[in-house]
C-alpha cells in the first residue's frame, strides 16, 4: 500500500471491519470498538449467510455502540490522516448516528430505512474518527474506511482460517451494491495455507469450489481484473526431524495454476518468488527474521 500510494497518490488504510479479533496486532491503524455483536463466516454457530457483507462479516449494534479509527505514522507513511471517512450499513428502520472527527464536536446523522447498502461519508483532514450508534433497530453494519479522494485505495479483507471457498456464499446483490460504492480495479486472491496438507495430492474439490467463487466475483465485479497468488512455501519436519517444504504445498500450487488458467485470470507463483524449496526456513532463520517460527506465515 505504501509503495503504491507513494507512486500513484492516495492515503489511508482503506476498509476496516467494525470489530476485529486481531485489531491489537494490526500496525496500520489504531482500532477500538465496543457494544457490538460480531458475526463472521468462520463462526461455527449463529451466522446467517444472507446477512453478510463483502468481508464475510456483519455486526449488530447495541445503543451506544462505537467504533473508532486513528491513523498512525510509525509503521508506514500516508496512514496518519485521510481525506474521506465512510461507514457502511443496511437499515430496515431509521438509524441515528453521530460522528466525531479529530476529537472535535459530534455531528449527528439521521437516515431512513433502505432496501440496499447505505453509506455516510465525511470529508476533511481526518486523523481520527469515532462513529457512535445512538439508535439503530434492524440495522446491520459491515465496516468503515479511511481513504484519499484520488490515487490508490487498498482494502485488505483478512479472514483468518478461510480457504476462500466462503466467497461463494456472499449474496450477489450485496457484492454488487459494494461494487457501486467502492468499484475495484483489481481483486487479488491469496488463499490456500489452510488447505495444504502434509501428503495432500488431490485438491479436486478445492479447485471446483474456487472456480465457482471466481465466477461469482466476475459476475459481481465485471470491471475488475483478478489475480490469484499461489501459496508460499510452508515447511514441516520429515521423519528425521529435518525441515523441508511440505509435499502437499507443491501439489496445491499446481492446482492453483490450473484454476487460474481455466478461469482466465492472472497467476503469480509466490512459492517461486520466495526462493522455492525450503525458502521459508531461510526466511525464519534470517537476521532479522522475516517469517514466523510456525514456518507457515511470512
Protein language model annotation of sequence segments:
Residues 111, 159, 231, 270-272:
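Active-site donor-binding loop signature of nucleotide-sugar glycosyltransferases
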Residues 201-209, 244-251:
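Alpha-helix N-cap and loop-to-helix initiation/capping positions
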Residues 3-11, 147, 177-181, 190, ...:
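Structured segments of extracytoplasmic/periplasmic soluble domains
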Amino acid at each position: 500500500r505504501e509503495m503504491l500510494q507513494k507512486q500513484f497518490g492516495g492515503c489511508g488504510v482503506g476498509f476496516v471491519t467494525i470489530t476485529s479479533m486481531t485489531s491489537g496486532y494490526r500496525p496500520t491503524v489504531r482500532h477500538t470498538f465496543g457494544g457490538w455483536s460480531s458475526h463472521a463466516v468462520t463462526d461455527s454457530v449463529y451466522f446467517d449467510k444472507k446477512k453478510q457483507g463483502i468481508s464475510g462479516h456483519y455486526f449488530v449494534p447495541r445503543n451506544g455502540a462505537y467504533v473508532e479509527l486513528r491513523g498512525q505514522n510509525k509503521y508506514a507513511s500516508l496512514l496518519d490522516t485521510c481525506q474521506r471517512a465512510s461507514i457502511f450499513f443496511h437499515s430496515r428502520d431509521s438509524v441515528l448516528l453521530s460522528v466525531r472527527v479529530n476529537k472535535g464536536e459530534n455531528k449527528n446523522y439521521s437516515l431512513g430505512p433502505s432496501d440496499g447498502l447505505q453509506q455516510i461519508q465525511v470529508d476533511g483532514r481526518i486523523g481520527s474518527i469515532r462513529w457512535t450508534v445512538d439508535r439503530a433497530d434492524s440495522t446491520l453494519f459491515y465496516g468503515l474506511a479511511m481513504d484519499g479522494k484520488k490515487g490508490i485505495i487498498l482494502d485488505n479483507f483478512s479472514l483468518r482460517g478461510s480457504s476462500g471457498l466462503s466467497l461463494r456464499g456472499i449474496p450477489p446483490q450485496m457484492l454488487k451494491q459494494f461494487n457501486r460504492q467502492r468499484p475495484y480495479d483489481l481483486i487479488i486472491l491469496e488463499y490456500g495455507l489452510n488447505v495444504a496438507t502434509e501428503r495432500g495430492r488431490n485438491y479436486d474439490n478445492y479447485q471446483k469450489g474456487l472456480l465457482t467463487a471466481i465466477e461469482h466475483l466476475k459476475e459481481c465485479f465485471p470491471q475488475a481484473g483478478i489475480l490469484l497468488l499461489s501459496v508460499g512455501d510452508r515447511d514441516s519436519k520429515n521423519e528425521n526431524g529435518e525441515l523441508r517444504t511440505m509435499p502437499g504445498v507443491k501439489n496445491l500450487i499446481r492446482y492453483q495454476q490450473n484454476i487460474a488458467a481455466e478461469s482466465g485470470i492472472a497467476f503469480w507463483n509466490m512459492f517461486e518468488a520466495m526462493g522455492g524449496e525450503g525458502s521459508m526456513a531461510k526466511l525464519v532463520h534470517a537476521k532479522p527474521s522475516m517469517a514466523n517460527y510456525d514456518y507457515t506465515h511470512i
